Regions:
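Positively charged n-region of N-terminal signal peptides that target proteins for export
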Residues: 1-4, 19
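Sec-dependent N-terminal signal peptides
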Residues: 4-13
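N-proximal helix/coil linker or "cap" segments that precede and/or mark the start of modular domains
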Residues: 17-34
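Structural micro-motif
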Residues: 33-34, 115-119, 134-144
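A short beta-strand-turn-helix
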Residues: 36-55
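Short active-site neighborhood of thiol/selenol oxidoreductases, capturing the structured segment around
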Residues: 49-72
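Structural microenvironment flanking redox-active thiols in thiol-disulfide oxidoreductases
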Residues: 66-113, 129
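Thiol-/selenol-based redox modules, centered on thioredoxin-like
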Residues: 139-176
């Protein structure tokens, strides 16, 4: 009996440790967040644009997984479903764990801003994930909504299913 209980406790501990390793430690939503100092595409320190002024739709992108949700984001851009006078969108590129040199990633981001007037800033040390309680964001495209009151109300990591895309549109409609 003792061996069975010890085995069960060891298994529970291993499962818990494995969940923490995989980054399953995201804070529950909604929760308050702070504006952070990141870098613009010229490596100058900048705060997150529009924070406290408007609701913000944030694309927190791992350059290694930039194709996650590609069709969805193109569709969103073309149909303007996430656009409105009360919301602004911006991209934050994670730099810490990418296989690509930062200069190349910055160059690609600058070209994108020239093409569609996007706002893109850089997170060189995964500060956003740490400070905002997002858990592990490595190898994920993360879609977030931050209210103008500084509250993170929506956060999804990875490839969104059709159901999650529909859920996103329901949420973003409240903040447009």
């Amino acid at each position: 009996m003792k061996k069975c209980i010890i085995s069960m406790l060891a298994l529970a501990f291993a499962i818990s440790a494995n969940a923490q390793e995989k980054g399953d430690d995201m804070q529950p939503l909604p929760h308050k967040i702070e504006n952070l100092e990141l870098l613009d595409l010229r490596k100058n320190i900048t705060k997150i644009p529009f924070y406290g002024e408007k609701n913000i739709l944030i694309f927190y992108v791992d350059p290694d997984k930039y194709k996650q949700n590609h069709e969805f984001t193109v569709e969103m851009e073309e149909n303007h479903r996430a656009a409105g006078e009360n919301i602004e969108g911006l991209g934050i590129k994670k730099q810490k764990n990418t296989i690509f040199p930062n200069a190349i990633v910055r160059s690609i981001a600058r070209k994108r801003t020239e093409k569609n007037n996007a706002t893109i800033i850089a997170d060189p040390d995964c500060i956003v994930a740490k400070e905002w309680g997002l858990g592990d964001c490595n190898n994920y495209f993360v879609l977030m909504i931050v209210t103008k009151e500084g509250e993170l109300v929506y956060c999804k990591k990875g490839e969104l299913t059709k159901e999650e895309q529909a859920e996103f549109y329901e949420v973003v409609d409240k903040y447009r």
